[in-house]
Amino acid sequence: MPVVVIANPKGGVGKSTLATNVAGYFASQGHAVMLGDADRQQSARLWLGLRPTQAKPISTWDVTPDLIVKPPRGTTHVVLDTPGGLHGWRFNDVMKLADKVIVPLQPSVFDIFATRSFLDQLAAHKQAGKLQIGIVGMRVDARTIASDKLREFVDTLGLPVVGMLRDTQNYIHLAARGLTLFDVAPSRVEKDLEQWQALCHWLDH
């Protein structure tokens, strides 16, 4: 049962957007998916409450700041949305569970600096075991100097960039209805699905 953790110590970088869409991707493939939310804002849990009954099912994984309940038997894929400022024992407990960690990162010098020490922590866990780490650029305009700087920064870490996602209202409109890119006609979100291909391949391997 793969456990995919979405983590970044900085708030507002798109963790919940990634978590819900990763869960939506797994569900679209017919997997038994649970989505957990360790963030006090409970954005992912609120999103699940909006999800239509006719959409591919995604169950709630009960997670609190003090307790992570083991997913029930029959669950095949687990996604965990984490809070900003994830550190200490919570960081260690979450990393023990994780098979893969996705770090959303915006092309801003402030985001890059705020994330550096966290990525160093992750790299230490990666060396210690099975953990796979992937960086996803969020709200990226490939034509800008900022996106080039983001790639330069990630290159210095030796971590793979598994996706670069554009800034689009599609995520906002779909989230308001409890949906993901993988719940609607592909023709409506064709450009975004293209950007997800590399990330989906990484998730599956």
Residue spans of the language-model regions?
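Conserved C-terminal guanine-recognition region of P-loop GTPase G domains, centered on the G4
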Residues: 113-130, 138
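P-loop/Walker-type NTP enzyme "switch/lid" segment
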Residues: 2-13, 20-96, 175-183
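Beta-strand-loop-alpha "switch" segments that mediate conformational coupling across diverse proteins
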Residues: 141, 151-182
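Structural beta-sheet core signal
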Residues: 35, 80, 103, 135-137
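Hydrophobic anchor at the start of a short beta-strand
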Residues: 32-33, 78, 132-133, 161-162
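NTP-binding/hydrolysis catalytic cores, primarily Walker-type P-loop NTPases
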Residues: 181-205
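Inter-motif core of Ras-like GTPase G domains
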Residues: 89-109
